[in-house]
Swiss-Prot record:
Its main location: cytoplasm. This is tRNA-specific 2-thiouridylase MnmA. It comes from the Bacteria. The active site is at 94 (nucleophile), 188 (cysteine persulfide intermediate). The keyword Transferase applies. Belongs to the MnmA/TRMU family. CDD domains: MnmA_TRMU-like. One of its GO terms (biological process) is tRNA wobble position uridine thiolation. It is found in: Cytoplasm. PANTHER family: MITOCHONDRIAL TRNA-SPECIFIC 2-THIOURIDYLASE 1 (PTHR11933:SF5), TRNA 5-METHYLAMINOMETHYL-2-THIOURIDYLATE -METHYLTRANSFERASE (PTHR11933). Catalyzes the 2-thiolation of uridine at the wobble position (U34) of tRNA, leading to the formation of s(2)U34. Pfam families: tRNA_Me_trans (PF03054), tRNA_Me_trans_C (PF20258), tRNA_Me_trans_M (PF20259). InterPro entries: MnmA-like, MnmA-like_C, MnmA-like_central, MnmA-like_central_sf, Rossmann-like_a/b/a_fold.
Length: 339
């Protein structure tokens, strides 16, 4: 008898091919699509793709409306973070509090042990690892998964290169149009840019002061929520300067602090809200402070839910609210939120 598995399906090529791959390995695939926001046109297009795949594979699929839960657990905290002068990482948060939690709970309702997604990552049931395709690796966004979920998760695309997934999908007539469609943006509820999302909920266009590290007013900006640490454009300085970067954001004063690249340098970072797969309290490893940055060697000391990180080489653009993820080569050891 074939083993059942619940597959998160988005209507894109990765999750569609994941379902196809698992069926070819003998699994009885049950597809599930989760609505996380009220953009109905977006959902209808995705569900139409899932219907195609389900028909081709002869599998059942379910549509779960989790708009209310997403609003409370991910969307509102995203808005609140920017209002507080932080730079949030909604995908890493969503993977923990929404996507995988809802997927596991739905599998439990059906009495199914395993779940799968089209993420480019690997797991051995204890740790998460980088995908073979480093250009598409999503392990950074998965550091926050509950440890007890890992033995139940399968990432079939962990050893695949994206270009090969698309090539193979193109060979299957009903998947061809899905393989040809444009890739979706990283943040599913952001159609254009995050500022447009914020404008729906709060005042964003608020001209304010640009100050140097001594508090001297040296320019003006268009509203602090437009900026993140390390940004060097979008504000005006009264006099010509060497390139200046955002060093800090002071929301209650609607101010941004700017300085030189040297002043942007960090060699110490503190993380809170840790999620660790490794039990050690002190260790050497690598840290990644943004999705598209390289890993930096560091020394970590953990005290409760706080990690003090000493970097062995400087990093720039460390933004409060972003995820700091610990690696041992390709293995994800855990991580937390930069404060």
């Amino acid at each position: 008898m074939s083993k059942k598995i619940v597959v998160a399906m988005s209507g894109g090529v990765d999750s569609s091919y994941t379902a196809n791959l698992l069926q070819s390995r003998g699994y009885e695939v049950i597809g599930v699509y989760m609505k996380f926001h009220p953009r109905e046109e977006y959902h209808q297009k995705n569900i139409a793709n899932i219907q195609k795949v389900a028909k081709h594979l002869g599998i059942e699929y379910h549509v779960l409306d989790r708009t209310k839960e997403f609003q409370e657990r991910v969307y509102q905290p995203f808005v609140d973070s920017y209002v507080a002068g932080l730079t949030p990482n909604p995908c890493a948060m969503c993977n923990r509090v929404m996507k995988f939690t809802e997927l596991i709970e739905f599998a439990d309702e059906l009495g199914v042990d395993n779940v799968a997604t089209g993420h480019y990552a690997k797991t051995d049931g204890q740790f998460i690892y980088e995908a073979t395709d480093k250009s598409k690796d999503q392990s950074y966004f998965l550091f926050n998964l509950k440890k007890e979920f890992l033995p139940r998760i399968i990432f079939p695309l962990g050893d695949w290169y994206k270009e090969n997934v698309k090539k193979e999908a193109m060979k299957i007539l009903l998947l061809k149009s899905i393989a040809e469609q444009k890739e979706s943006s990283e943040i599913c509820f952001v159609e254009t840019n995050y500022i447009d999302v914020l404008k729906e909920h709060t005042e964003v266009e608020m001209p304010g002061e640009v100050v140097d590290t001594h508090g001297k007013v040296i320019g003006e900006h268009k509203g602090y929520m437009h900026y993140t640490i390390g940004k060097r454009k979008g504000f005006r300085l009264f006099k010509a300067h060497q390139p200046h970067y955002v060093l800090d954001i002071i929301p209650h004063k609607n101010r941004i602090v700017v300085g030189t690249k040297e002043q942007l340098e960090k060699r110490q970072i503190v993380l809170r809200g840790l999620n660790m797969f490794l039990d050690q309290k002190e260790f050497d490893c690598y840290i990644k402070i943004r999705y598209r940055t390289h890993k930096v060697p560091c020394h970590v000391k953990i005290d409760g839910s706080v990690a003090s990180v000493t970097l062995k080489e400087p990093v720039y653009g460390v933004a409060k609210g972003q995820a700091g993820v610990f690696y041992d080569e390709e293995k994800v050891l855990g991580g937390g939120w930069i404060v």
